[in-house]
């Protein structure tokens, strides 16, 4: 049986290659742009096929399969239909990587990581309903490297088995992981402080906090993904961004609230002071707003992938 060679000819790499040739996909009908992608894909397949033949490889090069062939696409639809008929397909939500420049979802294999310098902030969320456990003048301290996601915060996630300390300071009563108290107080430049109580994370579940920027609540929830190696032990949770946030949010019936459009810009429900800004620019705007209202405890910059 001869080897049947095949080429995967779909995806962003083809579209990006066409755009590098000077083609603007927004200035032509989608069908026309697809025609150019089709022609480019065939051209590359022919080049690679010629190279493979010259290298002396043996295969049935007269009958290759290409994922852009209509018969191949039809077969995919047949398989999908069979899966649907067997009850294997359901409609749901899932967080995916997104490219603002391409306005398209990305596969994990298409994501490249580079070291970048990002702002990291520590923010106070004041208790609104302490459920008889905490007073309303207590603040949970969250940490994030993506300040632009703070407007989408719906929850604060703790680890059920961790011990959390209530610390009295000149900057308010703060809830942080007990093993990080001294380290965090030094970071916040707080020299006069006292630990007045301890709580298991499980004791603080369902307490609500006031979102520092908007008239809505942030729910205290529990999740196994919360670790003790960095941050504060109180994880800023925006279910519309990131897998951990999304899946733990589902357990508490929190919506996957996304306030960023396909271009990577903040949407109108973020408020006039933020709407229209690209997420990288929103980092600074959100941080300044938090500082202005007294919710920002610390701003640092870190290098990470």
Report each predicted region and the residues it spans.
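N-terminal, positively charged nucleic-acid-binding surface of large information/translation enzymes
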Residues: 1-171, 238-270, 282-286, 290-305
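Protease-associated
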Residues: 151, 155, 162-234, 243-247
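Extended, non-globular alpha-helical segments
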Residues: 211-212, 277, 286-289
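Short glycine-enriched, charge-decorated loop/helix-capping segments at active-site entrances
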Residues: 271-276
